[in-house]
């Protein structure tokens, strides 16, 4: 293995591995370093006791023509990653104020959401239909310029422009804020919500790589290696070397590696405040980075069931009272959980062959602060009570349970360097002031240093898709920089 490269990518999460693979394909001598034993970051797939599953519950989205499809195509490996599309892929449950739980089937790509089915589930009466259709129509057809005008508007402020029933309000505010971008709806950026909703409407949901998301990132890593990239796993980068305002490489526990370009997938805050060190940046930039707000973390449970209980890959539950705001999160942190919560549950049935015959692995959980010091128990107790109420059969067949919280998420993704951050599900929160035109630049104010992944380099996508989009955009920026900055 060499010790000199054109570019070093710190982190092989969805953004890092995509970026590294593209740069290798375009001829740059590339090293990708990750502290984990496999690629994929928070989206890695594990194999254990005959199961093959993601660390975390996965909402497969969007269904077609996503950034992920585009990246596989550019890398020329679209034939090597089988994207399966279970249809139907899930059930959406809505609980009425009188306590009845209705359900609506969610179809795969090619079967966009039918407003009539949704109206039935949400009890939209004739008197409200016109206004609800106005909301759906405006969101689904909003032009890019108008979307950009929502960069400074929260989801709740946007919804308040419409005189809609509470059920429709909650559908948007719960599912498109906490349920999709993992941020409270009072700060969720409306331009992000609208863009992602449009992708869902046009592309549908439910597209998923056979073998798991991690298998797809392994295929991308394979493409990187086939193009000459080195991939160094189980190696933590301790420091990104900077001298005279330029990066020079990285220091790891396995030695130093040199390159005039370093792309960090380790999160913008850990990169600036720890790996490079604040002494290399202007005070104002350090303050700006320190004040960035993470997405929410997650308190999750994995259950091994003695028999397959859930028929579909994913299930959602919400009610009029599941809209989560910053105030709810703060109250929950002090022990006051809301009475009703949004619940997401997913099963290994997403992809055949992912569980031993006769068994099923089920994920569930609830958003909680990204703070690695928060004990997830309060959230887990609540979510387990809700699972028992809504899906009693699941609880009856639990053979084994595993639990995790934000500290665990941090351990396999980014370090916690700012109080309250580290265990974020997505990365930087897609909130007002941090999205669209306000998204941090992927080019750091140090020569040769870039950020990649959910934190920078793309906006207006959902999680894995966001990180992969960043991988593609940042790879282009790096290539341009490489060509214009001869060594
Ligand atoms: C509970 C949960 C549920 C989720 N559900 C979904 C979902 O349903 N659908 C969806 O699309 N997405 C989902 N996501 C989010 C998705 O996984 C992330 O948005 C995505 O993984 C972000 O990719 P990334 O490239 O930004 O970085 P990450 O995935 O965070 O990867 C960063 C990589 O950098 C490495 N790294 C960091 N620091 C160092 C260092 N110092 N040295 C070496 N390596 C380092 C890490 O080990 C890691 O591999 C979920 C996440 C969680 C936690």
Residue positions per predicted region:
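N-terminal Rossmann-like FAD-binding beta1-loop-alpha1 element of flavoenzymes
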Residues: 5-32
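Glycine-rich FAD pyrophosphate-binding loop
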Residues: 24-48
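Dinucleotide-binding Rossmann-like beta1-alpha1 core, especially the glycine-rich loop
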Residues: 51-131
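Rossmann-like flavin
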Residues: 94-190
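A glycine-rich dinucleotide-binding beta-alpha-beta segment and adjacent secondary-structure elements
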Residues: 172-179, 393-459
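Helical element adjacent to the flavin cofactor pocket in flavoenzyme catalytic cores
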Residues: 196-247, 251
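Mid-domain catalytic core of redox enzymes
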Residues: 238-356
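C-terminal segments that line or cap access tunnels to active or ligand-binding sites in enzymes
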Residues: 306-412
């Amino acid at each position: 293995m060499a010790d000199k490269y054109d570019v070093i990518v710190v982190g092989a999460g969805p953004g890092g591995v995509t970026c590294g693979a593209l740069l290798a394909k375009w001829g740059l001598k590339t090293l990708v370093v990750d502290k984990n034993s496999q690629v994929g970051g928070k989206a890695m797939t594990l194999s254990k006791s005959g199961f093959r599953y993601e660390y975390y519950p996965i909402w497969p989205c969007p269904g077609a023509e996503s950034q992920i499809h585009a990246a596989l195509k550019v890398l020329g490996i679209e034939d090597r990653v089988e994207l399966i599309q279970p249809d139907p892929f899930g059930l959406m449950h809505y609980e009425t104020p009188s306590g009845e739980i209705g359900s609506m089937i969610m179809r795969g790509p090619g079967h966009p959401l039918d407003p009539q089915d949704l109206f039935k589930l949400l009890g939209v009466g004739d008197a409200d239909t016109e206004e609800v259709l106005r909301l759906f129509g405006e969101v689904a057809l909003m032009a890019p310029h108008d979307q950009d005008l929502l960069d400074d508007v929260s989801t709740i402020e946007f919804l308040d422009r419409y005189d809609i029933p509470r059920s429709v309000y909650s559908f948007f505010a719960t599912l498109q804020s906490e349920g999709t971008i993992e941020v409270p709806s009072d700060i969720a950026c409306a331009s992000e919500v609208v863009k992602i909703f449009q992708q869902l409407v046009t592309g549908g949901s439910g597209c998923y790589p056979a073998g798991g998301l991690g298998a797809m990132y392994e295929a991308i890593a394979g493409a990187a290696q086939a193009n000459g990239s080195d991939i160094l796993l189980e190696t933590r980068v301790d420091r990104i070397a900077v001298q005279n305002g330029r990066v020079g490489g990285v220091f790891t526990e396995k030695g130093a590696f040199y390159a005039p370009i370093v792309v960090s997938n380790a999160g913008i805050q850990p990169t600036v405040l720890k790996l490079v060190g604040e002494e290399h940046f202007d005070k104002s930039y350090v303050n700006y980075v320190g004040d960035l707000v993470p997405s929410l973390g997650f308190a999750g449970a994995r259950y091994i069931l003695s028999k397959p209980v859930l028929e579909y890959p994913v299930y959602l539950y919400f009610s009029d009272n599941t809209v989560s705001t910053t105030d709810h999160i703060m109250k929950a942190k002090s022990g006051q959980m809301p009475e009703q919560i949004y619940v997401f549950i997913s099963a290994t049935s997403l992809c055949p062959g992912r569980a031993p015959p006769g068994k099923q692995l089920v994920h569930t959980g609830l958003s909680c602060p990204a703070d690695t010091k928060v004990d997830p128990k309060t959230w887990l107790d609540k979510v387990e009570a809700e699972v028992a109420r809504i899906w009693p059969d699941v609880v009856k067949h639990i053979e084994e349970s595993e639990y995790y919280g934000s500290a665990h998420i941090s351990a396999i993704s980014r370090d916690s360097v700012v109080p309250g951050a580290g265990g974020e599900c997505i990365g930087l929160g897609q909130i007002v002031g941090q999205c669209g035109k306000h998204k941090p630049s992927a080019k750091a104010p140090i020569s040769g240093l870039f950020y990649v992944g959910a934190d920078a380099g793309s906006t207006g996508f959902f999680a894995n898709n966001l990180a992969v989009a960043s991988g593609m955009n940042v790879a282009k920026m790096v290539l341009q920089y490489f060509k214009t900055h001869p060594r």
